From Swiss-Prot:
One of its GO terms (molecular function) is ribosome binding. Belongs to the TRAFAC class translation factor GTPase superfamily. Classic translation factor GTPase family. LepA subfamily. The gene is lepA. GTP binds at D16, H17, G18, K19, S20, T21, N128, K129, I130, D131. It is a peripheral membrane protein. The keyword Cell wall biogenesis/degradation does not apply. This is Elongation factor 4. It comes from the Bacteria. It comes from Mesomycoplasma hyopneumoniae (strain J / ATCC 25934 / NCTC 10110) (Mycoplasma hyopneumoniae).
Length: 598
């Protein structure tokens, strides 16, 4: 196959800027998928992706256009899924930068463009939704030039929804994106693993981009990170359905089935090479994924623990970023502590478990990894608040900080700066992008961002602000563990880590919420928030009482007193042994205590 006829590219866009729609139009225009078979968001395979209008898993598809072969790698646009983007960009030579004509450049678009520039990709600016009344093409062109520093003079103007300008996009791919580097078939094989999924009949299917050499059916290859060896049983391309081939050559993107039974054997971003003629070094530039937040997942029905375990195993086959380990809680029984890339990532996993495996899940409040130095000098890394040592054994606590870059219209600057201050933010910089838009840079504690920062940012800015972040370092903070006691019993799953300055308002808010949520019992239930052994907030859930005197009529008053005393003694005994029923909403209440920490 002639290398000069291949073009590998990805589409970079913020959520809702029309990326999946553009991919649909390209598939339709090139007859890769017939109009009859084309579904909206064709490359988004999960129902969840279509419902939320977002791309979660990346997809690779081969497209024929005239005498050329394109490999389009569809990428996610949300900040939580940056790892998916970085992994797909490394498999391409060019990127289509898709910008909404009415909204302009957003934070996540910029983050992904920088990833593309780091990979030395050719970037083609495309302005979408030009048919909208609010479209401002000249302003967006100026933004692209000022913010990113690439020429937007020849930016392609399209409407993906109405199919306007699609042919110009295809011609630009041919003329502007360079072909893959030429390579001799006899060169050692180097192929980048950029995705994988699990097939119940064929095991783990890996998606690869062949950089040098070739790979054929029957070849034995090894992963360079762990040296595990496998033989190729089938390989081929996606068009967008799988088509089998005998070999994949340099520049091609395709899939390989090799009876890989354990998903943990496949590390996305690894390099594969042939055992007989191995490459000396792997391809550069891949990082191991590190979760930024941790949450406990527990089945509502404790008998579904094994089903939850199997379900997590199956999902982790296609989502290599999920890290989990078993844990137990006195209140909730057996479950798992799971590491995520962000709050959206967590919500999506919970929805997938509930939909695909019919599980009912209780999720505890998300937390981050804290570095705790004990008084004896020992350093511990703890992500579960219930495992924190007692305050008198702690010498210092360090928490992760992020560098947040927030894009926003000038009119919302005051409110967003106020939000960052509420979240213990440290001001770094303010940049003027144009007459109307600003880029605000803050250092923020990660634990403050994972709760409701994104939602509040959107509501304060009427949806116009966007942000991206990176974890930068750990800093010493005045943090304390806040425990909740119900009827004198500590509920470990309700424990949380709070800043000393916000402990009292947060404790008061949480006890009031729990008082409203937890149903009344036959006995009085005190709800206490404690730090160490000190109670800092308390509410009482009043008991409901049975009218034991209802059957009395007339007679001596001592009879009435005797019945009431008997009821009182019974309630006292019940209070000692009674179990408080804690509904799922109580755990969600923790997420909602971040309303404002002023």
């Amino acid at each position: 196959m002639d290398n000069k006829k291949i073009r590998n590219f990805a589409i970079i866009a913020h959520i809702d800027h029309g990326k999946s729609t553009l991919a649909d139009r390209i598939l339709e225009f090139t007859n890769t998928v017939s109009k009859r078979d084309l579904k909206e968001q064709h490359l988004d395979s999960m129902d969840l992706e279509k419902e939320r209008g977002i791309t979660i898993k990346l997809n690779a598809v081969q497209i024929r256009y005239n005498s050329y072969i394109f490999h389009l790698i569809d990428t996610p646009g949300h900040v939580d899924f940056t790892y998916e983007v970085s992994r797909s960009l490394a498999a391409t030579e060019g990127a289509l930068l898709l910008v909404d004509a009415s909204q302009g450049i957003q934070a996540q678009t910029l983050a992904n463009v920088y990833l593309a520039l780091e990979n030395n990709l050719e970037i083609i600016p495309i302005i979408n939704k030009i048919d909208l009344p609010s479209a401002n093409v000249d302003k967006v062109k100026a933004e692209i030039e000022n913010t990113i520093g690439i020429s937007a003079e020849n930016a392609i103007l399209i409407s993906a929804k109405n199919g306007i300008g699609i042919e110009k996009v295809l011609e630009a791919i041919v003329n502007l994106i360079p072909p893959p580097q030429a390579s001799d078939e006899k060169d050692p094989l180097k192929a980048l693993v950029f995705d994988s999924y699990f097939d119940i009949y064929r095991g783990v299917i890996i998606f690869i981009r062949v950089v040098t050499g070739k790979i054929s059916v029957g070849d034995t290859f090894k992963f360079m990170a762990n040296n595990l060896k496998f033989s190729v049983i089938e390989l081929g391309i996606s068009s967008p359905n799988q088509v089998k081939k005998e070999a994949l050559f340099a520049g091609e993107v395709g899939w390989v089935a090799a009876s890989i039974r354990n998903a943990k054997d496949v590390e996305v971003g690894d390099t594969i090479t042939l055992v007989e003629n191995p490459a000396k070094s792997p391809l550069p530039g891949y990082k191991k994924l590190v979760p930024v937040m941790y949450t406990g997942f527990y089945p509502v029905d404790s008998q579904q623990y094994n089903l939850l375990k199997d379900s997590l195993e199956k999902i982790s086959l296609s989502d290599s970023s999920i890290i989990y380990e078993p844990e137990s809680s006195k209140a909730l029984g057996f479950g798992f502590r799971i590491g995520f890339l962000g709050l959206l990532h967590m919500e999506i996993l919970q929805e997938r478990l509930e939909r695909e495996f019919n599980l009912s899940i209780i999720a505890t409040a998300p937390s981050v990894e804290f570095q705790i130095t004990r008084t004896n000098g020992q350093v511990q890394i703890i992500s579960n608040p219930s495992l924190f040592p007692e305050p008198n054994f702690i010498s210092e606590i360090r928490e992760p900080y992020i560098l947040a870059k927030i894009f926003l219209p000038e009119e919302f600057l005051g409110q967003i700066m106020g939000l960052c201050q509420d979240k213990r933010g440290i001001y770094v910089d303010l940049e003027y992008i144009d007459d109307f838009r600003r880029r605000l840079i803050y250092k923020l504690p990660l634990v403050e961002v994972i709760f409701d920062f994104f939602d509040r940012l959107k509501s304060l800015s009427k949806g116009y602000a966007s942000f991206e972040y990176e974890v930068i370092d750990y800093q010493v903070s005045k943090l304390q563990k806040l425990d909740i006691l119900l009827n004198g019993q500590k509920i470990d799953a309700l424990s949380m880590i709070v800043h000393k300055d916000f402990a009292y308002p947060k404790a008061r808010d949480l006890t009031q919420k729990l008082k409203e949520i937890i149903p009344r019992h036959s006995f009085e239930v005190p709800v206490q928030a404690v730090i160490g052994s000190k109670v800092i907030a308390r509410e009482t859930i009043k008991a409901y009482r049975k009218d034991v005197t209802a059957k009395l009529y007339g007679g001596d008053v001592t009879r009435r007193k005797k019945l009431l005393e008997k009821q009182k003694a019974g309630k006292k005994r019940m209070k000692s042994f009674g179990v408080v029923d804690v509904p799922q909403e109580a755990f969600l209440a923790i997420l909602k205590t971040n309303v404002s920490e002023k």
